[in-house]
Amino acid sequence: MPREIITLQVGQCGNQIGMEFWKQLCLEHGISKEGMLEDFATQGGDRKDVFFYQADDEHYIPRALLLDLEPRVINGIQNSEYRNLYNHENVFVADHGGGAGNNWASGYHQGEQVEEDIMDMIDREADGSDSLEGFVLCHSIAGGTGSGMGSYLLEALNDRYSKKLVQTYSVFPNQMETSDVVVQPYNSLLTLNKRLTINADCVVVLDNTALNRIAVDRLHIPNPTFAQTNSLVSTVMSASTTTLRYPGYMNNDLVGLVASLIPTPRCHFLMTGYTPLTVERQANAIRKTTVLDVMRRLLQAKNIMVSSYARTKEASQAKYISILNIIQGEVDPTQVHKSLQRIRERKLANFIEWGPASIQVALSRKSPYVQTAHRVSGLMLASHTSIRHLFSKCINQYEKLRKKQAFLDNYRKFPMFADNDLTEFDESREIVQSLVDEYKACESADYIKWGMEDRSKTLSADGTMDLSLPSS
């Protein structure tokens, strides 16, 4: 029986990447823009019910909630050619429509105020599921709504659906460009804090710095637009869910997927790689793809969607905690075995010493309704200790602002920071620093010992933290 997943799209960025994700899923399952099954979609064997359900007239509706505090992006979706795809009861835009002003505290406070309305929508979707497995949250950590309201919803889901798994697709800001959002470091740290570290079971890191680099270097797009980077994100999202929708022998539910990648609860931030990447105008530049070629390329830095400064800093010490390669296409399992052997012989992946040093591989069918130029494609989901440098950069940028006491008045206007109470900032910094320390400790052979001593010290400050994976 399919295990259903409810998707929450929060804020401008969350709704934009969510929209691209649903477009891709419709293509892969032969569903029209109106939600009707196309006449040619007769092959079956896919699980549409994981992400869609059928209305009384048999058209497919995404199990999705579209949530924002300002109307522009959602209005765009509702006026697009996909306007009849969604359940309009699952759309929430704040009455005032003024947004969160790129302020985490505003987004969090407004989330608190509208909790009842949104949780009613979530409860209705959950009640309509036969066997709900969990939730997927799409958001950005840098602005106001996706970070603040997204944080509040993560806490609310943890309270109400503590046994359900929560995975996020979290967009990290472009660190190489000057941001329009001057308080981005505050917002990022507050979101990384308890919310993504404690209230999520798995976080797929979508690093805008790396996405822009890949668009420029790999796809030869000089000035990539948001639409083009969002297209890269939808490719990752659809590929990472392919084993749930086109099930094989393993990793055909979210719990299995997450459990295979996350041996230690807090180190649940995953980086991704995808190959081959093409855009429409490159369709003629087709090369031969093999399992070995795809798996080798997935380990190359240029194909990994996390910033180069995170991957290259102290690179000799950095290690993989786990790797899952999802290979799509007509693949002979013996080729997979030979490819893994070759990668092991060449020592292309440096693993931790305290866990299984192996690349897991899940084979998945390609959608019969989407024609691709390549015979084999692959997505890598990996837990890698170098991700800590991304978090360290967030801390460093936060400290530069905090040292100057810059823009703090914007946050003091809201209850959590009233009366100049900035403990939420201090606690957030401590939690993110402890996360950095834990990833650093993972590089050592005696990490398990560190886990027993240091982790208990770190967590004693907050007795509410439950770090166990939810049971299914």
Curated annotation (Swiss-Prot):
Main location: cytoplasm
Keyword Transmembrane annotated: no
Binding annotation for GTP: 142-148
A molecular function GO annotation: GTP binding
Any one of the GO CC terms: gamma-tubulin complex
Gene3D superfamilies named among the record's database cross-references: Helix hairpin bin (1.10.287.600), Tubulin/FtsZ, C-terminal domain (3.30.1330.20), Tubulin/FtsZ, GTPase domain (3.40.50.1440)
GO biological process, one term: microtubule nucleation
UniProt superkingdom: Eukaryota
Subcellular location: Cytoplasm, Cytoskeleton, Microtubule organizing center
Summary of the function given for this chain in its UniProt record: Tubulin is the major constituent of microtubules. The gamma chain is found at microtubule organizing centers (MTOC) such as the spindle poles, suggesting that it is involved in the minus-end nucleation of microtubule assembly.
Name by which UniProt lists this protein: Tubulin gamma chain
Organism: Anemia phyllitidis
Higher taxonomy: Eukaryota, Viridiplantae, Streptophyta, Embryophyta, Tracheophyta
